[in-house]
A protein has these predicted regions:
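Extracellular and select intracellular beta-sandwich modules with Ser/Thr-enriched
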Residues: 82-88
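Strand-loop-strand motifs at the edges of beta-sheets in extracellular beta-sandwich domains
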Residues: 50-67
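A short beta-strand micro-motif common to beta-rich folds, especially ectodomain repeats
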Residues: 33, 69-81
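Proline/serine/threonine-rich low-complexity linkers at boundaries of modular beta-sandwich domains
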Residues: 1-13
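Solvent-exposed, low-complexity, repeat-rich "mucin-like" stalks and linkers
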Residues: 12-40
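An acidic-aromatic substrate-binding cleft motif
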Residues: 91-118
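Aromatic-lined carbohydrate-binding/catalytic grooves of carbohydrate-active enzymes
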Residues: 108-110, 122-213
Length: 213
């Protein structure tokens, strides 16, 4: 019989996750303040950098920072039981992935049978099980999303399992989650789908257009 030894999170707010985040100047910023505690929680940020805004009910911070630099701010999370605070640093420059990425990858669960519905169900589980409140944020689509052939202009497209990856990315971002995708440097992926060989820059532009993080 499965059992859980991890103690339940307290009713009072507790801010979790990394204390630093990297982003490039002018790039889209997305970060959900990870916090546990009895719902509803209310989120506030002191010294929020210009160009960013925080949703006080979801804790999702979005926007763009134009200028390079180190930005220190204070996260504040409140509920009817208490308050928690934490100093948080954003490094705006060329340094990304300043902490180990935390998230989910489709391969071990779904292999080549991953599709849009299964991805979204897994994302909902990330939220409903509280992983997002502990700093888990990436939803990564592994192999099996690619169409059988490119468009006439060489652009890579998704197959029928993912009708619109741009909309999928937008859906994930609205939940405060980040969008990851699999690619291969060879002509084909391990699963026999399209690789990025001789289309590396073109595919990278497509991923950016879809909102891949």
């Amino acid at each position: 019989i499965p059992y859980i030894l991890t103690p339940a999170a307290p009713a009072s707010p507790k801010i979790n996750g990394a204390k630093i985040f990297g982003v490039r100047p002018g790039s889209p910023f997305l970060f959900k303040i990870p916090a546990t505690g009895k719902k509803p929680l209310h989120y506030y940020v002191e010294n929020l950098p210009e160009g960013l805004q925080v949703d006080k009910t979801s804790g999702i911070i979005t926007g763009k920072i134009k200028t390079k630099g180190e930005y220190k701010m204070t996260f504040i999370v409140k509920n009817g039981v208490g308050t928690d605070k934490r100093v948080f640093t954003v490094q705006c420059g060329n340094l990304l992935a300043l902490t180990p990425p935390m998230g989910w990858n489709s391969w071990n669960c779904w292999g080549l049978s991953i599709n849009d519905e299964r991805l979204k169900a897994s994302a909902q589980a990330m939220i409903s099980k509280g992983l997002i409140d502990h700093g888990w944020m990436y939803m990564n689509i592994d192999d099996g999303w690619e169409a059988e052939q490119r468009e006439a202009n060489g652009k890579i497209v998704s197959n029928k399992k993912f009708p619109n990856l741009k909309k999928t990315g937008d859906w994930l971002h609205n939940k405060g989650l980040k969008f990851g995708i699999y690619s291969s440097p060879g002509p084909q992926t391990c699963g026999g789908f399209l690789g990025s060989y001789h289309h590396e820059a073109q595919d990278a532009r497509s991923y950016a257009d879809w909102g891949v993080d």
